[in-house]
């Protein structure tokens, strides 16, 4: 496995320079583009990594999985009364579809859906941002995971579209807490700094029927784990979920910080990171690395 990871990074490294680092969040636009890392974590507890796997980065939308899991853990099936689990077919920050469907987001991985999930968690936790940070520390086994305050503030200052979605949902009765407070929590989640090793470990319960081996916790039931993985497979990569299924064939979740996490049910979790994005907002080199890894080992679930 170690030799294969080194070989794959060497093969995809020439793609660096062909994408673009996210700059609509100013604090992300300063990240050096020439970075590439990968980590593979097995259900047997073995970790394999290569490249810049220990370099922390902003998880961004990858955090939506953690928020969803928290909501399921504490609120159960009731969350699905407020949002769906269908692909949207629209941009992740679309207002048009949200209004047409009367404030009920299609799934928890578009921004509107993630905001509803944060609203649910805001009602459940006294300090949602701290609860999320501590939850992720527990899942990753890394007590040093922190929120990047500069990134969180940068996102809050450019919150107009997310605020518009929240207020629109509030007008339809599907948003119950103070919008600004929920946005603060949401951006705090997105601004978590983790590396490939942290994320591969943090997602391991999704490859193991909901059981986190290194913390000894049953995070989700087997059925709930299947449900989260299925939504990742259909909606986890913005408008490129179909292409990811075609090329990689695994449940996955990406973020504009350049990270992608993929789950091999029953076997492994993988995190790859390279900050340059393709036109769909997913890591260009990261997609290629995951495609090569899945193809070489035969991991596709299809």
From Swiss-Prot:
Keywords: Hydrolase. It comes from Pseudomonas fluorescens (strain Pf0-1). Gene3D superfamilies: DD-peptidase/beta-lactamase superfamily. Signal peptide: none annotated. GO terms for biological process: glutamate biosynthetic process; glutamine catabolic process. GO terms for molecular function: glutaminase activity. Belongs to the glutaminase family. This is Glutaminase. The keyword Hydrolase applies. It catalyses: L-glutamine + H2O = L-glutamate + NH4(+). Substrate binds at residues 61, 111, 155, 162, 186, 238, 256. Coiled coil: none annotated. It holds the Pfam family Glutaminase. Its EC number is 3.5.1.2. It is an enzyme of class 3 (hydrolase). Homotetramer.
């Amino acid at each position: 496995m170690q030799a294969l990871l080194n070989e794959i990074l060497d093969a995809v490294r020439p793609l660096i320079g062909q994408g673009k680092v996210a700059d609509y969040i100013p604090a992300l636009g300063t990240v050096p583009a020439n970075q590439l890392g990968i980590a593979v974590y097995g259900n047997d507890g073995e970790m394999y990594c290569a490249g810049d796997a220990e370099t922390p980065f902003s998880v961004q939308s990858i955090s939506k999985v953690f928020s969803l899991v928290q909501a399921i853990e504490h609120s159960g099936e009731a969350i699905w009364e407020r949002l769906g689990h269908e692909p949207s077919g629209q941009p992740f920050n679309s207002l048009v579809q949200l209004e047409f469907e009367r404030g009920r987001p299609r799934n928890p991985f578009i921004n509107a859906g993630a905001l509803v999930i944060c609203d649910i968690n805001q009602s459940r936790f006294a300090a949602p941002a701290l609860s999320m940070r501590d939850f992720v520390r527990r899942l990753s086994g890394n007590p040093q995971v922190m929120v990047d305050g500069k990134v969180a503030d940068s996102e809050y200052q450019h919150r107009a579209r997310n605020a518009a979605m929240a207020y629109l949902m509030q007008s339809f009765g599907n948003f119950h807490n103070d919008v600004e407070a929920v946005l603060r929590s949401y951006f705090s989640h997105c601004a978590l700094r983790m590396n490939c090793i942290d994320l591969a470990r943090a997602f391991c319960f999704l490859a193991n029927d909901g059981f986190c081996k290194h913390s000894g916790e049953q995070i989700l039931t087997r059925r709930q784990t299947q449900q989260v993985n299925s939504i990742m497979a259909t909606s986890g990569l913005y408008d490129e979920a179909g292409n990811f299924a075609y090329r990689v064939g695994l449940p996955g979740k990406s973020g504009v910080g350049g990270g992608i996490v993929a789950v091999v049910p029953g076997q492994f979790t993988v995190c790859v990171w390279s900050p340059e994005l393709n036109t769909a907002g997913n890591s260009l080199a990261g997609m290629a690395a995951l495609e090569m890894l899945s193809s070489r080992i035969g991991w596709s679930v299809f």
